[in-house]
Structure formats: structure tokens, C-alpha cells
């Protein structure tokens, strides 16, 4: 069974490489998204249980999420296993270096989801019904990204700033993505706006309800392809 899934990954990689090469030949860069966490049943957790907060039976001791806020009164319980950051530190962040290296094999630019989790991450006891019982823990911070940069060189990274962004998170963004002397206003000139995210409906949904015919018609014509969207 493992060999079967390895073969599927091989075929996907083969086809994706052809697609990326073609896109790049047309002057198109591909932006890829990397989630900060992996799933409990992922190949990463299966092959490297010691890098995650798992017990002797590979059951999580704490899981990921975010605290209660204006979006949810009980917070968000994602359920992903958390990292043992001290183990990652002791190995020179090699797993993360390899992960980022492969991302840049797939994409030209990498967007890191939940970037604030590298500064502080929310830890929720395993088995909790909501995220309300969780607490903040300190993440690896700039140390991780310095290790990645030393191994891979300076790469193009987009840091997601969704959710509560503390001063320490903003400092982490400035320290890694920009030189220390970069003016604050230059930071915001380099921002990228996305029309949607994973928890939102696609942008076509509100467009279908627009009542201004010219704007609605022109934009819908632009984003539609054939009979689909």
C-alpha cells in the first residue's frame, strides 16, 4: 500500500513539473500555499513521530487551533498535532528545511499559512471539545527562518497575516522578510491581497448577486471559462 501511494506521488510530481515548466516558459509564476501544520494521518507524522507532540501510542497530547474571537465564541479546534519545537531545534530544523526546499521545487513563491504560529502557537489539550481550554506557547521565531535561509538562500515568501497579529508577530515578519532598516511604509507596499480564503465561499458567489449589470456582466465574463466557472 505504501508503494502504491509513493507511485501516485511520483506520477503527480512528474505531471506537475511539466505544468510548472510550461507556466514559467510563458512568464507565469506559481504561488503555492503551505499550511503550518500537517495532519495526524499524514506521511510526515507517520514517518517522524518524534517531531510531534505524540505519546507512546502516537496519540496527540495537544493539538492546534485558535482561541475564541469575533469569528467564533469557542475558538477553532483544528486538531492537528503540534510540533516538538525543542526537537526541531536540536536537529537544526532539518525537517523544515527539507519541507521548504520541496515547496520551492513545486512553486516559485510560497505563501505560509498561519504565519503567526511561528511566533506563538495555540495549544489545546487533546480530547477537548472546543478550543476554549487552550493556551499560548512560544514558537521558534526567527531562529527557524534563519536556518532555512542559511540552507536555501533568500526565497520569495508571503506571510499570511489573518487573525490577531501581535507586535511580536509583526516584528517576526519584518525581521525575516525585510532588512532591519526597511521603512514601515515599504513593508505595506509589498502586501498582497487575496479575494478569498479556505473558510470563505469563492468570489463567484457574491458576484452572482450583484445588481449593477455592467460591472457584474463584465467581471463574470472575465472569470468564466466555457460552461463552468
Question: What do these predicted regions represent?
Answer:
Residues 1-13, 38-229:
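Alpha-amylase-like alpha-glycosidases and glucanotransferases acting on alpha-linked glucans and related
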Residues 10-37:
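Conserved, well-ordered alpha-helix/loop/beta-strand core segments that scaffold catalytic motifs
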Amino acid at each position: 500500500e505504501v508503494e502504491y501511494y509513493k507511485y501516485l506521488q511520483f506520477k503527480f510530481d512528474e505531471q506537475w513539473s511539466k505544468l510548472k515548466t510550461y507556466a514559467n516558459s510563458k512568464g507565469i509564476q506559481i504561488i503555492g500555499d503551505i499550511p503550518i501544520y500537517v495532519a495526524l494521518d499524514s506521511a510526515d507524522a507517520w514517518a517522524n513521530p518524534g517531531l510531534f507532540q505524540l505519546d507512546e501510542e502516537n496519540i496527540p497530547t495537544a493539538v492546534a487551533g485558535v482561541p475564541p474571537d469575533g469569528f467564533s465564541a469557542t475558538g477553532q479546534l483544528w486538531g492537528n498535532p503540534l510540533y516538538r519545537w525543542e526537537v526541531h531545534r536540536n536537529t537544526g530544523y532539518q525537517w523544515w528545511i527539507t519541507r521548504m526546499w520541496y515547496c520551492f521545487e513545486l512553486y516559485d513563491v510560497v505563501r505560509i499559512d498561519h504565519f503567526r504560529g511561528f511566533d506563538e502557537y495555540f495549544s489545546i489539550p487533546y480530547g477537548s471539545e472546543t478550543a476554549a481550554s487552550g493556551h499560548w506557547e512560544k514558537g521558534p521565531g526567527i531562529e527557524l527562518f534563519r536556518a532555512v535561509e542559511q540552507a536555501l538562500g533568500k526565497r520569495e515568501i508571503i506571510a499570511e497575516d489573518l487573525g490577531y497579529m501581535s507586535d511580536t508577530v509583526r516584528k517576526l515578519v519584518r525581521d525575516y522578510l525585510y532588512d532591519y532598516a526597511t521603512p514601515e511604509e515599504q513593508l505595506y507596499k509589498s502586501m498582497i491581497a487575496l479575494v478569498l480564503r479556505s473558510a470563505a465561499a469563492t468570489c463567484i458567489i457574491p458576484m452572482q448577486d450583484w445588481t449593477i449589470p455592467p460591472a457584474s456582466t463584465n467581471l463574470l465574463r472575465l472569470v468564466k471559462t466555457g460552461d463552468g466557472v
